[in-house]
Amino acid sequence: MKKLLVTGSTFPRWANDTEPRFILDYAKAMTKYYDVTVLVPGAVGAKEEEELEGVHVIRYHYFPIHKFETLCYPGAIVPRIKQKKIRILLVPFLLLSLHHQLKKHSKEFDVVHAHWLIPQGIMQMSVKNTPYIVTGHGGDVTSLNKGILKSMKLKCLERAKAITVVSDALQDYVKQLYPNQKTSIIPM
């Protein structure tokens, strides 16, 4: 059976968690076709590695003092930074750790599905020889569209084997910003 690595930054930390579970639900559905592993940031109180509802989950640490790994949970990265501005200092650590984990794990998989253009998509594009799919969920598509980040997002889309978005509006946005890109809509 082919192997699929799913990456994201929003994922249940444990059974019955209130964090959105759409990536877990997607990963569970894909187990019919692939041997699936999910790679997500660590969270205080969450297991580093486990089987969650039949899906293998790896949670990577991104800061030396684990109790300060508060960038992604609860909630999402941007709202967490807005809550406490100092959390922006965790972003480089998250990016470096994600890149390290992708280099470490991607070669074990036939394909990677990166949820969010930033940070998962742009980090995945730097890992050579592993085909990837990228999904845009919202702000990762509609914001940060100037300068180097726009260039990185464009390269991410160009190198992706497939591009998906979760709505018609996001598909239109991708087509405006990045002409000649084929996108599919897969609501989550």
Regions found by a protein language model. Give the residues of each.
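Flexible loop residues that form catalytic
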Residues: 9, 117, 168
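Short loop/helix-cap segments at secondary-structure boundaries that form the rim of catalytic
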Residues: 46-53, 126-127, 174-178
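A conserved catalytic-core segment of Leloir-type glycosyltransferases
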Residues: 41-93, 100
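An aromatic- and histidine-rich active-site surface loop
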Residues: 44, 88-101, 111-129
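N-terminal subdomain of nucleotide-sugar transferases
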Residues: 1-61, 107, 158-162
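Donor nucleotide-sugar binding/catalytic pocket of nucleotide-sugar-dependent glycosyltransferases
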Residues: 37-40, 56-59, 133-137, 150, ...
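Alpha/beta-hydrolase
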Residues: 7-8, 114, 136
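Nucleotide-sugar donor phosphate/pyrophosphate-binding loop at the beta->alpha transition
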Residues: 16-23, 128-133, 138-159
